[in-house]
Amino acid sequence: MQKIRRDDEIIVIAGKDKGKRGKVLKVLADDRLVVSGVNLIKRHSKPNPMLGVQGGIVEKEAPLHVSNVAIFNAETSKADRVGFKIEDGKKIRIFKSTQKPVDA
């Protein structure tokens, strides 16, 4: 079970976007995440009239390493760590500071 999953609210704790918050769009296999509005890069794209694609400078999210983010606890309004607990025979994720489930 992964500590950070798709649609989790996270906060960046290291790097150029430190302090920014966003929602996880995609979790990649090599411990990297794509987060909405964080780690934006600019890419130049050629126009393709056959596909109807207009050229120009496109801004998109680049992946960042999972060690540079922490899950955001809305109750405490701070970054938090994730732990696991077995409840009713199921393994659930909990916030370490409040011991409450993440997926509540």
Curated annotation (Swiss-Prot):
Entries under InterPro entries matching the protein: KOW, Rib_uL2_dom2, Ribosomal_uL24, Ribosomal_uL24_CS, Ribosomal_uL24_KOW, Translation_prot_SH3-like_sf
Family, similarity comment: Belongs to the universal ribosomal protein uL24 family.
PROSITE patterns according to UniProt: RIBOSOMAL_L24
Organism of this sequence: Azotobacter vinelandii (strain DJ / ATCC BAA-1303)
GO MF terms, alphabetically ordered: rRNA binding; structural constituent of ribosome
Coiled coil: none
S-S bridge residues: none
Subunit comment: Part of the 50S ribosomal subunit.
Function description: One of two assembly initiator proteins, it binds directly to the 5'-end of the 23S rRNA, where it nucleates assembly of the 50S subunit.
Protein name (Swiss-Prot/TrEMBL): Large ribosomal subunit protein uL24
GO cellular component: ribonucleoprotein complex; ribosome
